[in-house]
Amino acid sequence: MQVKADCHIHAVLDGVDWKAAIRRHERKPDDAFLRNMLRNYAEQGYTYLRDGGDRWGAGIRARELAAEYGITYRTPGAPLCQKGHYGGFIGTTYETVAEYAGLVSSARKKGCDFIKIMISGLMDFNQFGVLTEPGMHPARIRELIRIAHEEGMAVMAHANGYETVIPAAEAGVDSVEHGAYLSEEALFAMKEAGTVWVPTLSTVGNLRGKGRFSETDICRILENTSYYVNQFCKMGGLLASGTDAGAWAVPHGSETEILLLHQAGAAQESLQKGTAKIIEKF
């Protein structure tokens, strides 16, 4: 039976104002907001949600409530990010590998479902081909993934740029999130590793017509990522639909992702197999 899933959401965010959204949950997770979110997903037929994490416990609380709505909910707790690099606004930071290893061990003991790592910057939506910062050193990427796997935890990686995705895939990362600016080599590495790619096209496609960023650059970014989605599908790679719901202009329950994936040429078989693997691994 086909499962309706969103493989990348953020319960802590609302798609409108990330700072105000975080304030909503800072003292304690807002049950009214979370219940409304889960109810809306259930009414749309979703039965599986995978959270990208937050350090205030909104995703953890959503997991506790989700069964009431017939939803299987998976969360890493807080995403783990290197101090001074992208992700600190929402995740838990570390400075050394030993500190990271301690956070992984703690997450496992607390019952988190998997590990989320931040290993690259974000797309600059006003400059095609530009990321907000370089990716993490390949050796460090491999080490982070190895440590998490040795703890028995699957790894979800925020990763943009082929230089970042290739070592992550070669290290056996379980899923790559976003994946802007890839290459044929990066696609092959993901295919060989059985890595599921969750392109989150909505985070780019939903910006069109909003007037906040360069329309030309947004369209070029979407076209570029869509091209690699098509190529990955042709080589038999595994894809899964994840909206990054909660990101600006991506409300919870957004249906744009599957439309954008199909427009890019993603085959239903690739999406079904990729979603099934996400559910199995995470």
Model-found features: residue ranges?
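His/Asp/Glu-enriched, well-ordered alpha-helical/loop segment
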Residues: 150, 222-282
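Short, electropositive alpha-helical surface patch
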Residues: 59-72, 132-138, 142, 167-181, ...
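Histidine/acidic residue-rich metal-binding segments in metalloenzymes
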Residues: 98-118, 123-197, 218-239
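Active-site environment of divalent metal-dependent phosphoester hydrolases
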Residues: 10-14, 55-59, 81-83, 121-125, ...
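Glycine-rich anion/phosphate-binding loops
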Residues: 54, 92-102
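Acidic/histidine-rich helix-loop elements
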Residues: 13-28, 83-94, 126-134, 208-217
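Divalent metal-dependent hydrolysis catalytic cores, especially in the metallo-beta-lactamase
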Residues: 31-60, 70-80, 112-126, 154, ...
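Metal-associated gating/positioning segment near the N- to mid-region
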Residues: 2-65, 84-86
